[in-house]
């Protein structure tokens, strides 16, 4: 099956090509939605491919649990079956690493753009030349177009009374001893997780940022390409702790810079100028 969206811009991330559907809820899904909303409000014929987690039936409830603005369900593709290729005039991949973009070149039919994401951009020379990269040069010096990935600020917030952590197997998994230490330090913490089955964990996303504090936990690769929940907490005035971060992470350090405005996606953003 070839998905011909007939869109000027299709926004997606790479997980729809993964047979295992193992990634679960991640910030890349919200990046897809953020940039869809931005392009839509610029009058662009834009579509989204939602790879996993959200279905057509759960989409509206999912949106209301995060955003304070509306999204057009008719612009969303939810696919339960594998597709051979996706087609649009321009395709924006929010999480494309070199491996994915090289492996699936034949499946991306259109002008391909990708946000830089992960340490592979700093370590690999196997750059896919058919892709236009949008990369923050403070993290990825000299790669593609200098562009800082941003966060849509239109967020629903219902304050909560417990700290929160995001513990998922994709890249944020913690060892058993780390989990015990985390609960010791935050006895009433609520953890969203797709693999834990303990009293403090839930496999249901926390809606409306309903927590008192975000506890940012270590990631295995020591490189968080765009920790958006840090920015969302800063936008909403929610406290956050950096728990056991005893390593240097250029992506995290970038998001902790004082100037919050540089990370907020607004109407004046210039990303639209790079698409034809």
Model-derived features: positions:
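N-terminal pre-catalytic "stem/leader" segment of glycosyltransferase-like enzymes
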Residues: 1-99, 188-189, 198, 227-230, ...
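Residue-level signal for short, function-critical loop segments
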Residues: 15-17, 52, 118, 170-171, ...
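Conserved catalytic-core segment of nucleotide-activated headgroup transferases in glycan assembly
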Residues: 21-38, 42, 137, 142-204
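A short acidic, amphipathic alpha-helical/loop segment
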Residues: 35-38, 102-108, 125-129, 177-185, ...
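Catalytic core of nucleotide-activated saccharide and alditol-phosphate transferases
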Residues: 73-179, 260, 264
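Short acidic alpha-helix that forms the nucleotide-activated donor recognition element
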Residues: 84-86, 201-212, 235
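Short, acidic/turn-prone active-site loops that include or flank metal/cofactor-
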Residues: 117-121, 194-198, 220-221, 245-246
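Acidic donor-binding loop of glycosyltransferase active sites
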Residues: 209-222
């Amino acid at each position: 099956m070839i998905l011909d969206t007939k869109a000027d811009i299709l926004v997606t991330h790479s997980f729809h090509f993964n047979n295992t559907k193992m990634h679960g809820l991640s910030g890349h899904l919200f990046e897809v939605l953020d940039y869809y909303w931005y392009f839509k409000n610029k009058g662009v014929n834009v579509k989204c491919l939602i790879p996993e987690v959200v279905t057509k039936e759960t989409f509206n409830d999912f949106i209301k649990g995060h955003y304070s603005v509306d999204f057009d369900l008719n612009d969303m593709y939810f696919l339960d079956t594998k597709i051979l290729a996706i087609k649009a005039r321009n395709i924006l991949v929010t999480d494309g690493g070199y491996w994915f973009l090289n492996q699936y070149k034949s499946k991306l039919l259109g002008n391909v753009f990708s946000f830089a994401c992960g340490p592979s951009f700093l370590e690999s020379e196997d750059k896919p030349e058919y892709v236009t990269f949008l990369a923050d040069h403070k993290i990825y010096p000299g790669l593609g177009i200098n562009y800082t990935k941003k966060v849509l600020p239109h967020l629903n917030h219902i304050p909560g009374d417990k700290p929160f952590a995001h513990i998922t197997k994709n890249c944020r998994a913690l060892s058993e001893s780390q989990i015990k230490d985390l609960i010791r330090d935050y006895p009433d913490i609520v953890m969203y997780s797709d693999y834990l089955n303990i009293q403090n964990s839930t496999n249901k996303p926390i809606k409306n940022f309903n927590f008192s504090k975000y506890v940012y936990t270590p990631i295995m690769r020591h490189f968080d390409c765009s920790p958006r929940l840090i920015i969302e907490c800063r936008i909403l005035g929610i406290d956050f702790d950096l728990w056991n971060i005893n390593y240097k992470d250029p992506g995290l350090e970038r998001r902790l810079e004082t100037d919050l405005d540089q990370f907020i996606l607004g109407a004046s953003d210039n990303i639209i100028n790079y698409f034809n």
